[in-house]
Each structure stands twice: as C-alpha cells, then as structure tokens.
Design a protein with these regions (language model features):
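Short sequence/structural segments immediately N-terminal
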Residues: 7-541
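Bacterial N-terminal signal peptides
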Residues: 1-6
C-alpha cells in the first residue's frame, strides 16, 4: 500500500515567477562568458520558452553587480509547477517499507553484522532503505552520522512525505543549535558523517561545491568543511536537476566522482561492456572556468542516472594501503567511485587506489566498507544484457486518473507499481502472482547464502581468537587476514546491495560461495596451526 499528498493539480502552479529579459542573461551566460554554455543549453531544449525568472530570483541585483549571485531554486516544487504527476509521485510513501528497520537483527538481512564489522560506525545503525523523499531526513537522523544531534520533532512526522520534501527541518530539529562540533549527544552513537556522503542525499549545494569537492576560492564548501554546518544548509532530497539538466532538460549526471570514473579515468559508462560504452557516452561539460562540471548523457540511460547513488563509493577517511598512513578528507580518494564489480574490487582498491576503509577490531584484517553497489551488480546480468534499465522496474510509465501518461518518480520495488506495469511487460505470459513468486525465490535463495557466508566469517573470527590466544605465529595470522579481507568483501557486498541479489543472482551465488571458501581456507590454516601449537606446548610439559 502506498500513499502521498498531492501538492499540485493538473494546472498546478505556485505564485507566478517574475520574468526577466533573457537576452540580458545571455549577454554573459553564453559560450564565452563566465557561465559558459548556458545560452546554448537553454535555447536548444524544451525549456527554451521557460523564462529564467522561473528558477532564479533576485536577478536585478545580480545584473547590477556580478558578484551578487541570484537565488537559484533547488526545490522540487519549482519543477512540480509544470511536472505535477512526476512531482506528486515522488511524494508517495510506501507504507509496506517501514522506517528504521535495522538490518542487523535475527530476522534482518544480517544477524551478526555488528560482530563482523566492528569497529565501523555502521554497527551503530544500519537501516533498510525506504521512499526516496526521506533519504535526506533518514541520513541526518541515523545514529551513526551525527552523534544524535539531529532528532525528530515528533515520531508522528516520520511518514510525512510532503513535509520531508518541503524541507528536512520541517521534521527534524538540532539538539544543540548554538554549536557545530561533532560529538555524542546520547549513548551508542557515532559521528561518521562528512560532506561527501551527503551528495547522493541532496545536491542543494551544487553551485557551492567545486568539482570533486576540492578547495576552491569560489566554493563555500569542500570535502573538509564542517559537516554540521554543511548538513544544516540542506533541505531537499534527490533534486530534479541531479538527473535532468534544468536548462535543456537533457539527461545528465552530476556526481563528480562518477564523471571522474567515466570520463577522467576513461573507464566508460559500462566498463565490462566496451561496445555499450561506445554507444552510451558521457560528455563532461565544465562551467565557471572549470569550477564545476556535469556529465551529459548521449541518450537517456536511467542506469547511469541511478548509479549516481546506487553504487559503491568511498566517502570517508581511511588508510593508505601502501604506507599505512591515515587518509584524511583532504585526500581526493575520499570522494571516489571505484567503478568495479565485486570480483575486481579488492584488487583495484589495493593496486589502483591504495585505499583501505578500516581494520577489523578482532583480527586486524584490512576491510573495505561497501555501500549499495546496485549498479555494479546489474552490469552483465541477464536483465541488463536484455536491455532492461532501472526505470523499467522502479520508475515505469504510468497513466494518471486524468489519462496523462508520465514516468513515475515513486522509486520503489516493481510490486508497488503493479507487476502488470513492470515484470509482465516482458514476461507477458506470467501472472502477477508468478512474478512475485519468482522474485521471492531468488531473494530467499541469496539471503540463505548471505547467512551461510556470515556463519563462516564468524567462525573464522572465533577461530582466530583461539589461535592468537594460544600463541600461533604472526606469519600464520597475517596469511589468514588476507583470507578474511576477501571473505568479508564478498559477504558485505551483498548485505549492502539492496535487491538481495535479485539484480544478478548468478553473480551473487558465485561471490558468496567464494566468501565461504575464503573463510574455510582461513579456518583450515588456523586449525592446523592450533594443532601444531598444542603439540609444541605438550612437548614442553
């Protein structure tokens, strides 16, 4: 069951915008001025008839003094004045996906997550995702991010999608607004947030952030900025312009780390499918003398748009794999998309990026913290090879009560759009019941493998403790740590991925089997060393 609040009707509009003379804007914002190419974007797209004043206010002061910036709307309601169906669908709440559903419970995706992932901040709270309209609110609220600084004004607001869209601070309050330091405000919390991790929650600061978050005299914020102040500056989750160019309406990506991977590093849109990468390309377009950049897609591709967030990426400090030194937010590697599937991931982290997220609290093994790698999992899957995109299942074409056909922006599981609008479009000989049955068969199978991999990881850690206590040589422990690193990545990848392996069940099974094998090989090394150590001790008696 889903629900939402309609803010705009078919004719819907907020107060009329004050129009401006677009030619005055074009005098500077052409392909030679400081806001290069804006004119070219505007005149060639379907927004050519939309006046600049629709999205930009306080323009008179800007015309008088270039250093006085106009106010640019980042609120989805601005787009909703024309795109009412898309906007209202974004506000929908999936009442069947409860908030604050912890993954690390006996009935969750991973019952022993806290044991296996100590001392990482995710052990404080690691919840299942819910409707996109809440993604900023949920980030600010999570126990691992701000030490409990930001709290709900009332639990009654937890499901108010319209209030969340209008601004996160309609729902949340700051426990200590007179300070801006990261600290614990309650027990069992962490202060792990930083500005980079918020850029897939909100791009309200897109005009105040230089490419890659590097320090820049024109940028208000960078990777090292005070994260509390940065958080307070945000209001809206998943802005429309993240995927749609506001001037030309062309499909685009705005996540700098993704543009870096595809264009700057030359890895392409589909690194495991070179021919597809040649067909679907990204053109890097720089603005304001290279201050920031966007990536224009050669054709609409919802996989690339969704991959701005539904992807594994570094967004935190870590450890340099070559030197062992601390990697701080000043290092560009703290804003990094590895753009790799699970089988190449650890190798690339060590060889290409020389980055380790943290070390296990018990074994000391190098650990890579995985974030929602839906895109990498989808690469090479049967569905991806068949031409299916994220939108086909999660944002299908719908028809409103008024008969208007539109793309749903209620990003949710196929079930809640109606299987007849998703799975049955291709599987036209199926019933909705069969689609649901098949989906759950795959998810149940993979969840079983996740739990088996988890069991063997826990056994590895427990055996490591016994071995270390008995005085097993460090040379053996060092070798076992390598197995632990591999096993952990190939387990947590699927804990972090949000389809329970449905996006690529064959890869999920192979990867999780590899995790189990790595754990078992590590255990075998330890058991052998334990037996040898016991014999050596017995000889001394």
């Amino acid at each position: 069951m889903v629900g939402g609040l309609s803010l705009f009707g078919a004719s819907g509009a907020q107060a009329a915008a004050k129009p401006v003379d677009v030619n005055t804007c074009y005098n500077c914002h052409d392909n030679t001025g400081p806001g290069s190419d804006i004119k070219a974007f505007h005149v060639r797209g379907s927004h050519a008839s939309i006046n600049c004043g629709h999205c930009h206010t306080e323009t008179e002061a800007h015309v008088r003094n270039f250093n006085v910036k106009p106010v640019t709307s980042v609120d989805q309601r601005t787009c909703g004045q024309c795109h009412a169906e898309q906007f209202n669908s974004m506000l929908q709440v999936n009442w069947d996906r409860p908030p604050k559903e912890e993954k690390a419970t006996p009935t969750g995706r991973t019952s022993r997550y806290d044991t296996l992932m100590r001392p990482h901040g995710f052990t404080k709270e690691h919840a299942e995702p819910r409707s996109h309209v809440f993604m900023l609110v949920d980030h600010l609220l999570v126990d691992r991010a701000y030490g409990g600084r930001f709290q709900l004004k009332s639990w009654e607001l937890i499901g108010d999608g319209a209030a969340a869209q209008a601004g996160a601070w309609n729902i949340l309050y700051d426990v200590e607004p007179e300070t801006n330091n990261q600290k614990a405000f309650r027990g069992q919390v962490a202060t792990a947030a930083n500005p980079v991790c918020m850029f897939c929650k909100s791009q309200d600061n897109i005009l105040n952030w230089a490419y890659m978050g590097d320090p820049h005299p024109k940028a208000k914020w960078d990777r090292t900025s005070n994260v509390v102040d940065f958080a307070r500056s945000l209001n809206h989750a998943l802005n429309c312009f993240t995927c749609h160019d506001p001037h030309s309406t062309e499909p685009r990506i705005t996540r700098d780390a993704q543009i870096q991977a595809i264009v700057d590093r030359g890895e392409g849109t589909y690194p495991y499918d070179k021919e597809k990468s040649k067909r679907i390309t990204v053109e890097k377009v720089e603005f304001r003398d290279g201050f920031r950049a966007i990536g224009l897609l050669s054709e609409p591709d919802s996989n690339m748009m969704c991959a701005q967030c539904h992807v594994e990426y570094n967004c935190n400090p870590g450890i340099d794999a070559a030197t062992g030194e601390r990697v701080t937010m000043a290092d560009q590697r703290t804003n990094l998309m590895q753009w790799s599937n699970v089988f190449d991931f650890n190798r690339r982290m060590y060889e290409d990026f020389k980055f380790i997220d943290f070390r296990n609290a018990v074994t000391g093994a190098d650990q890579m913290k995985i974030q929602h790698p839906e895109m990498e999992v989808f690469w090479g899957s049967k569905m991806e090879q068949a031409g299916v995109e994220c939108k086909d299942c999660h944002m299908p074409k719908m028809v409103s009560k008024a008969g208007v056909k539109y793309t749903s922006h209620f990003q949710t599981s196929p079930k809640y759009h109606g299987y007849e609008n998703t799975c049955l479009v291709c599987h036209d000989d199926w019933t909705p019941e069969r689609a649901d049955y098949t989906i759950h068969a795959i998810k149940n199978y993979v969840r079983g493998k996740i739990n088996k991999a988890e069991f063997w990881l826990a056994e590895l850690i427990d055996t490591f403790v016994r071995a270390k206590d008995l005085g097993v040589p460090e040379s053996v422990l060092a070798e076992v740590r390598k197995h632990h690193t591999e096993a952990n990545t190939h387990w947590e990848w699927w804990v972090a991925e949000n389809s329970d392996g449905f996006h690529n069940p064959e890869q999920a099974r192979e990867s999780l089997a590899y995790s189990m094998t790595q754990s078992q090989q590590g255990i075998a090394l330890l058991e052998k060393a334990i037996e040898e150590r016991r014999k050596a001790i017995a000889k001394l008696r």
